[in-house]
């Protein structure tokens, strides 16, 4: 038995022992002492005093564990750590990570505490590891020497047990993120140019290249108009009735006609259509903050907690779901939703996909139903091809590689942006108001016609009222509003709130919309009628893989104009005898990507601290490519997490996509190609592609999936027993309840879904407005 196999067997036995559970529970209980002054007595206590007074972010043991994780991945004797100590002596990586985790909110912090405790306690039960390397038995990680901690993490990385490999990924994030957050030293070491916000001369020069400022003036005025219709929490508390409900709990009560839950691509267009065509009172509820362009600070450490909602696939440990980085899905949590922080790519829905919805799902919708909405949205958001002069170095390399291989390539891509100046921070919000989004175009349209926005309000359930008899069209209940709670900027719960309305539109996204329905009892309503529970099912992600090519010439991946300029598509024909292009499905697409230090540190393979830092120093010579795969909708959203495994039928196609991407990189001139995998997956020549990128690698799912395109969970269709809503977004089970976001999509699209969701939102909004009348 190899040392790695012995280690895996030892850990497998350890995790099955009751003593491990007891030890872990004891550590987790200590973390719950939130009112204890423990943090103030630790070496890293000054941050906790500044932020929280006597409330701890991490316990002393957790702080020591975080410090050891950081030391394990970036030991104090490495170049970056030495320079940090010399040039920025007051920078404490543990404090930096504590502040970062705290800013993400209580749920994220609880998950991180559990992960930290797990990583700390696990070595106590790994006698094989201790014996082989001459370590005292029963050591916790916090007591390891940095070199031994590093060796321990490499054992986790190479484990044959998938949960342990996923734990390594979580530890890698903790161990690298606080190092690459540092602006004064680390950015200088890796030659990262940093935000244009820090270089006013460069910013002003590029702004001057724009042909006019008319559009920027218009979008600025739009955001001001929207701001006036955003409800302040203090005003609500002062002016609203407080109702006492069963159990003695108080809640604020708002009355309106239509409540739209979610302000992104779908919800914004529903609200705009209803505001224009009806006289109904409309309230748009958003769990995230209202941020204006000046709030987009172009720094990952500051913006990620405020604008990103990150969902991790989970690993079961003693009945508890703990987050991993095996599959990560990122969505937006701010007024304007994901559409405000995406890359503004505008791909029309593929005709074959819409046709399949009709033929295979019984959906009463076809491409012609969406075409007028696509056309209107294209004009409203000024969707146009990116000028050739603005294509970034990375995307030119993508085109060069595709041409060398004779692969058909498409581009420049079309985007909903006007006079983009190429700052490279599309994914952190457009500070210059050049990206045309729900925030600065669509929601202001609704606001100017009377709609209001309630930000920092998390909805948890729909209020349902039973209908007499058989109800209307088989619908047994009526929606009468929603319940939830106001939050602070971190998402911490404040007052309970009840919003009473005659109609409810869920547009909260493929995670929140299904969970709201689950909490409302809709799956049980369906089961009582003999229908499939369906809610949360048919979830897909585009199974996106991000990988990198290391080039000799600078490509500047953080300053792309636009983030994606060219792309390569692979098609499959569902009818081999047909020449009709409408029978050609997009199987996968390869697109150039933006990148910044925190995210890049997770993509870079980890062999040792020195090798990882060497890769990071070549940041500007790196091209990042995403393989977006049209996966089968086999995932499932649950009440607290999501379950996702790539379908076995997709393995061969996914492998073809990975190999094609690697070949393009080498054909473009890359000297090596590396993938976002648990173990280092590095190719130094094209001859290694077929052998290294194997079907077995895909089956073991050792390559990590990171997606921004969740779809499904409230699938539309024509079968009330199988589908959650009909083709107009109407719930099959609840009268007055609608869904209008990407959770509607019964199958994966194969292209970026935002434009499709815009069109579905406008289509559903127009249909609902026609039902209501003026």
Feature map (PLM): residue ranges:
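Flexible, low-complexity segments enriched for small/polar residues
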Residues: 48-190
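Conserved redox-cofactor binding core of oxidoreductases
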Residues: 178, 188-235, 364-461, 465-466, ...
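A glycine-rich dinucleotide-binding beta-alpha-beta segment and adjacent secondary-structure elements
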Residues: 422-426, 463, 671-747
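N-terminal secretory signal peptides
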Residues: 1-16
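FAD cofactor-binding and catalytic pocket of flavoenzymes
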Residues: 56, 316-318, 342, 532-659, ...
């Amino acid at each position: 038995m190899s040392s790695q196999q012995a280690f895996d067997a030892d850990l497998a036995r350890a995790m099955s022992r009751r003593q491990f559970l007891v030890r872990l529970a004891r550590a987790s209980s200590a973390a719950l002492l939130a009112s204890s002054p423990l943090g103030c007595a630790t070496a890293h206590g000054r941050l906790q005093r500044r932020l929280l007074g006597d409330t701890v972010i991490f316990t002393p043991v957790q702080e020591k564990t975080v410090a050891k994780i950081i030391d394990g991945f970036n030991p104090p004797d490495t170049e970056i750590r030495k320079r940090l100590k010399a040039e920025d002596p007051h920078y404490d990586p543990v404090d930096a990570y504590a502040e970062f985790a705290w800013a993400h909110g209580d749920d994220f912090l609880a998950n991180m505490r559990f992960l930290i405790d797990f990583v700390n306690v696990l070595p106590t039960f790994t006698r094989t590891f201790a014996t082989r390397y001459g370590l005292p038995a029963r050591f916790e990680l916090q007591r390891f020497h940095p070199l031994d901690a590093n060796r321990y993490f490499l054992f986790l990385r190479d484990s044959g047990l998938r949960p342990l490999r996923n734990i390594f990924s979580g530890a890698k994030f903790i161990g690298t993120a606080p190092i690459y957050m540092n602006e004064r030293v680390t950015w200088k070491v890796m030659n990262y140019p940093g935000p244009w916000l820090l270089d006013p001369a460069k910013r002003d020069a590029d702004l001057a290249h724009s042909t006019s400022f008319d559009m920027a003036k218009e979008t600025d005025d739009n955001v001001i108009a929207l701001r006036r219709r955003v409800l302040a929490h203090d005003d609500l508390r002062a002016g609203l009735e407080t109702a006492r409900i069963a159990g003695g709990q108080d809640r604020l009560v708002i009355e309106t006609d239509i409540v739209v839950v979610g302000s992104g691509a779908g919800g914004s267009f529903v609200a705009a259509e209803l505001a224009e065509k009806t006289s109904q009172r409309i309230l748009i509820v958003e769990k995230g903050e209202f941020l204006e362009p000046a709030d987009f600070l172009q720094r990952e450490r500051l913006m990620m907690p405020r604008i990103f909602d990150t969902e991790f696939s989970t690993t079961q440990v003693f009945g508890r779901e703990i987050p991993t980085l095996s599959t990560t899905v990122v969505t937006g949590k701010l007024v304007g939703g994901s559409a405000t922080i995406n890359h503004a790519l505008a791909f029309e829905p593929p005709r074959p996909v819409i046709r399949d919805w009709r033929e295979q799902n019984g959906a009463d919708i076809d491409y012609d139903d969406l075409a007028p909405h696509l056309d209107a949205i294209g004009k409203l958001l000024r969707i146009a091809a990116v000028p050739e002069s603005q294509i970034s170095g990375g995307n030119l390399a993508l085109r060069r590689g595709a041409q060398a291989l004779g692969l058909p390539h498409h581009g420049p891509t079309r985007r909903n942006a006007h006079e983009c100046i190429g700052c490279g921070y599309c994914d952190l919000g457009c500070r210059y108001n050049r990206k045309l989004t729900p925030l600065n175009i669509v929601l202001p349209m609704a606001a100017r016609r009377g709609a209001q926005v309630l930000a920092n309000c998390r909805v948890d359930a729909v209020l349902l009222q039973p209908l007499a008899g058989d109800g209307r069209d088989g619908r047994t209940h009526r929606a009468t509003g929603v319940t939830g709670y106001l939050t602070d900027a971190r998402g911490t719960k404040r007052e309970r709130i009840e919003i009473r309305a005659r109609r409810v539109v869920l547009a909260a996204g493929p995670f929140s919309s299904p969970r709201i329905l689950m909490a409302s009892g809709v799956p049980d309503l369906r089961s009582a009628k003999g229908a499939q529970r369906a809610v949360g099912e048919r979830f897909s992600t585009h199974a996106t893989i991000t990988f990198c090519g290391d080039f000799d010439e600078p490509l500047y991946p953080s300053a792309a104009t636009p983030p994606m300029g060219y792309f390569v598509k692979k098609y499959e024909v569902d009818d081999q005898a047909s020449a009709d292009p409408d029978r050609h499905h997009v199987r996968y697409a390869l697109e150039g990507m933006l990148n910044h230090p925190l995210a890049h540190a997770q993509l870079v393979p980890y062999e040792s601290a020195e090798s990882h830092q060497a890769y990071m120093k070549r940041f500007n010579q790196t091209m990042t490519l995403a393989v977006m795969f049209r996966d089968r909708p086999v995932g499932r959203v649950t009440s607290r997490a999501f379950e996702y495994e790539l379908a076995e039928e997709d393995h061969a196609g996914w492998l073809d996509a990975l190999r094609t991407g690697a070949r393009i990189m080498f054909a473009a001139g890359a000297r090596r190609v590396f993938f976002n995998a648990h173990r280092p997956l590095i190719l130094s020549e094209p001859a290694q592609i077929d052998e290294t990128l194997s079907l077995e690698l895909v089956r073991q799912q050792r390559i990590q999936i990171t997606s921004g395109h969740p779809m499904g969970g409230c699938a539309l269709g024509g079968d009330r027993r199988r589908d959650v809503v009909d083709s107009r977004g109407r719930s099959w089970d609840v009268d007055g309840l609608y869904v209008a976001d990407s959770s509607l999509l019964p199958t994966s699209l194969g292209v970026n879904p935002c434009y499709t969701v815009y069109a579905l939102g406008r289509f559903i909004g127009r249909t609902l407005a026609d039902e209501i009348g003026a």
